[in-house]
């Protein structure tokens, strides 16, 4: 796996699923391929994206700044600086300075990542802030190691939280989660179907599913009534893909 592929993997792991994630993935690919060289426009686009947390925007802004060539005097962006200040906690800043000194001695991506993984996400973000604000300088490889370690820490906590939700025995939470997943799947089906004539059937199925979820929410249904909703939708989607001559593994 190349270095940039690894960076893209880690960064995308902390972006919530949805159309915006696909858009961000495309921007990262373009940036890493050298196709997008307007850092100013890229940062303006990032700043106005909805849904993303300030920290995720800060990390993406840091990655874009590291990768896109820019004029020396280009102004640092406030939204990135604010996100990478470790919540203003002096302890985070102290640890960030210690980590920075260690990173100065590293020359490889993996070496930097290993060193950084023993620090908290707050300290890692503060250390990125030091580098972003030009208070410290490390090689791009080392900076990417720091980025990936930060994303791993964040993804770990997100995964723990997600696992807790999936494993919950509370039937109301499970019911709502199944309806949300069914609704999201229906939305994805509508986007994939596009405008071809054969797509009408898939669009109809997706539309009915979304109406059904809305009705279930409006009238309040038994928690078990949502069981299998998403799987039924995916089966319909696969049947549609087969007719279109597309063979894809089931993506559950």
From Swiss-Prot:
It is a peripheral membrane protein. Keywords: Host nucleus, Membrane, RNA-binding, Viral matrix protein, Virion. The keyword Transferase does not apply. Belongs to the influenza viruses Matrix protein M1 family. One of its GO terms (biological process) is viral budding from plasma membrane. This is Matrix protein 1. GO terms for molecular function: RNA binding; structural constituent of virion. Most abundant protein in virion. When expressed alone can form virus-like particles in transfected cells. The keyword Protein biosynthesis does not apply. Residues 1-164 are annotated as: Membrane-binding. It comes from the Viruses. A motif (Nuclear localization signal) lies at residues 101-105. It comes from Influenza A virus (strain A/Memphis/2/1978 H3N2). SUPFAM superfamilies: Influenza virus matrix protein M1 (SSF48145). One of its GO terms (cellular component) is host cell nucleus. Its main location: virion. Residues 165-252 are annotated as: RNP-binding.
